[in-house]
Structure formats: structure tokens, C-alpha cells
Design a protein with these regions (language model features):
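Negatively charged, low-complexity tracts enriched in Asp/Glu with abundant Ser/Thr
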Residues: 1-37, 70-82
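Residue-level signal for the start and early helices of compact helical domains
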Residues: 38, 52-54, 68
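Short beta-strand micro-motifs enriched in acidic
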Residues: 39-43
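Amphipathic beta-strand/beta-sheet edge segments enriched in Tyr/Trp
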Residues: 44-56
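A short, exposed loop/beta-hairpin motif centered on an aromatic-Gly-Thr core
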Residues: 58-65
Length: 82
């Protein structure tokens, strides 16, 4: 599993599993391990995903709390390809 979600804070339990699964699914094609932290973004009413990886890779992606899993996975994948 190339993306490991280390922590999820402030996300309702009913949505946490779906969000974590989408983030992990986005990284299945990666060749190097990456890490992710997911946290609620109370100022924007959504959540942020911080992704780190080799060679100083660090990106943050912001989502609405009601974004579909496919949207989350796609945007995380696009961010990983940058």
C-alpha cells in the first residue's frame, strides 16, 4: 500500500472510512511509499489531505465534506502526478 493514512482528525465517523479508502485507492499505482494525514477544515466546511513522500514531496489538497469518493481519489491522484 503506497499511501498510508496516519491520522484522521475531526471527520465524522460516517465519512471517515470512505475518505480514507479514496485516498489510499488514489495511490495504488505509486512505486514509492507516501504518507497522508486527513483533518477537518472548519473554516471552509470541508477537510484537507496532507500528502508527503520521498525527496521532500509535500502537497495539501482541500475538499468539501460531501465530495464523492471518486472525486477525492481523482484529485489526490492528480496531485501525486505533479
Amino acid at each position: 500500500m503506497p499511501i498510508t493514512v496516519f491520522d484522521t482528525k475531526g471527520i465524522p465517523a460516517t465519512r471517515r472510512e470512505r475518505i480514507e479508502a479514496a485516498v489510499v485507492a488514489a495511490g495504488r499505482q505509486l512505486t514509492a511509499p507516501h504518507e497522508a494525514w486527513i483533518a477537518a477544515d472548519p473554516f471552509r466546511g470541508g477537510f484537507k489531505v496532507l500528502i508527503t513522500g520521498p525527496h521532500g514531496f509535500e502537497r495539501t489538497v482541500t475538499f468539501a465534506l460531501d465530495d464523492e469518493a471518486a472525486v477525492i481519489a481523482d484529485r489526490v491522484w492528480q496531485t501525486l502526478e505533479e
